[in-house]
């Protein structure tokens, strides 16, 4: 046996349909396209979304809202999380890098600090955004806020 003698299994390869080659072929005449009409003619292609004259789905369904391409999404981190993180690692400065290292946020996400929970230690917190109450709570505890 060698590569030049290999053949596909019996019945595995079908011969292609040769249409429009005269009446003797069995596929002449209308060439499997039926009689007349746009679909029988060359160059025919129906419009995308065309449903045979029925009102298409994109016009039947009501239209709601849109996706704002300028939307900025922040990953929320609560003050209680910052407090537990600072206690566990004895940190006084918490940056986005610390949150990434702790597995709380992914590398490319923007971070917003929210005021759920309390902060008892003086922390310097770096983040992309802060809620007003979170900012006040951090400053009240003797810490500071750094917006990136």
UniProtKB/Swiss-Prot annotation:
Record-level Gene Ontology MF annotations: rRNA binding; structural constituent of ribosome
Protein keywords: Ribonucleoprotein, Ribosomal protein, RNA-binding, rRNA-binding
Pfam families in the cross-refs: Ribosomal_L27A
A GO cellular-component term linked to this record: cytosolic large ribosomal subunit
Gene Ontology BP annotations: translation
Keyword Lipid metabolism attached: no
Keyword RNA-binding on entry: yes
Domain of life, source organism: Bacteria
Region of interest: Disordered: 1-51
Subunit description: Part of the 50S ribosomal subunit.
Record's function text: Binds to the 23S rRNA.
Similarity comment: family membership: Belongs to the universal ribosomal protein uL15 family.
Protein name, UniProt field: Large ribosomal subunit protein uL15
Organism: Porphyromonas gingivalis (strain ATCC BAA-308 / W83)
Gene: rplO
């Amino acid at each position: 046996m060698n590569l030049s003698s290999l053949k596909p299994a019996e019945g595995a390869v079908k011969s292609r349909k040769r249409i429009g080659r005269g009446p003797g072929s069995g596929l002449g005449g209308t060439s499997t396209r039926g009689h007349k009409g746009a679909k029988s003619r060359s160059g025919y292609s129906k419009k995308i979304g065309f449903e045979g004259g029925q009102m298409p789905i994109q016009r039947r369904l009501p239209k709601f809202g849109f996706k704002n391409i300028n939307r900025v999404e922040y990953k929320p981190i609560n003050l209680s999380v910052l407090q537990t993180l600072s206690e566990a690692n004895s940190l006084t400065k918490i940056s986005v890098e610390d949150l990434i290292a702790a597995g709380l946020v992914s590398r490319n996400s923007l971070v917003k600090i929210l005021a759920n929970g309390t902060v008892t230690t003086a922390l310097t917190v770096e983040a992309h955004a802060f809620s007003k109450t979170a900012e006040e709570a951090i400053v009240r505890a003797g810490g500071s806020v750094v917006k990136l």
